[in-house]
From Swiss-Prot:
GO biological process: photosynthesis, light reaction
Keywords tagged on the record: 4Fe-4S, Chloroplast, Iron, Iron-sulfur, Membrane, Metal-binding, NAD, NADP, Plastid, Plastoquinone, Quinone, Repeat, Thylakoid, Translocase
The protein's name in its UniProt record: NAD(P)H-quinone oxidoreductase subunit I, chloroplastic
Chemical reaction(s) catalysed: a plastoquinone + NADH + (n+1) H(+)(in) = a plastoquinol + NAD(+) + n H(+)(out); a plastoquinone + NADPH + (n+1) H(+)(in) = a plastoquinol + NADP(+) + n H(+)(out)
Gene Ontology CC: one annotated term: chloroplast thylakoid membrane
Disulphides: none
Membrane topology of this protein: Peripheral membrane protein
Main location per the UniProt record: plastid
Lineage: superkingdom: Eukaryota
Domain 4Fe-4S ferredoxin-type as annotated: residue spans: 55-84, 95-124
One Pfam family named in its UniProt record: Fer4_10
Subunit structure: NDH is composed of at least 16 different subunits, 5 of which are encoded in the nucleus.
Entry note: cofactor: Binds 2 [4Fe-4S] clusters per subunit.
Length: 180
């Protein structure tokens, strides 16, 4: 009879432990009911890129001195810089500058080491095309600034309201490359 009593006691303890585990998991499940959804409806809602996001490269033709530092620091020698030497002023004249984003790894070395700051990273990350040759951007395409996600009224931006409270006017007045 003694082993039977200890068996009932063990069974009762296991039942109480199982009920406690189920209760704890149910409390965790209920704590998630008042949170915002994590997923977004992509084409209609976009998350705001962080300040140091490395998107498409923006190029300012007038600032470039054709020093080719960007080509030397690029791990895959990607930027193509065409220039000619002006003998009367003894300076390089930039003729053509292009980057093929089909091969670019968006490491940001070219932006960081540029002595004249003619290269900068933008928030643009939608570079998909049907033809890979369209990803080869010349100086005209690189010079276009992307439309800011924040300023576009057709797109609803997704902010994590529980962690960051951002004033929309403050975002529009900030001096980012996309708001010039």
């Amino acid at each position: 009879m003694f082993p039977m009593v200890t068996g009932f006691i063990n069974y009762g303890q296991q039942t109480i432990r199982a009920a406690r585990y189920i209760g704890q998991s149910f409390i965790i499940t209920l704590s998630h009911t008042n949170r915002l959804p994590v997923t977004i409806q992509y084409p209609y809602e976009k998350s705001i890129a962080s300040e140091r996001f490395r998107g498409r490269i923006h190029f300012e033709f007038d600032k470039c001195i054709a020093c080719e530092v960007c080509v030397r620091v690029c791990p895959i020698d990607l930027p193509v810089v065409d220039w000619r030497l002006e003998k009367n002023i003894k300076k390089k004249q930039l003729l053509n500058y292009s980057i093929d984003f089909g091969f670019c790894i968006f490491c940001g070395n070219c932006v960081e080491y540029c002595p004249t700051n003619c290269l900068s990273m933008t928030e643009e990350y939608e570079l998909s095309t049907y033809d890979r040759h369209e990803l080869n951007y010349n100086q005209i395409a690189l010079g276009r600034l992307p439309m800011s996600v924040i300023g576009d009224y057709t797109i609803q931006t997704v902010l994590n309201w529980t962690q960051i409270k951002i004033d929309k006017n403050k975002l529009l007045d900030s001096r980012t490359i996309t708001n010039y």
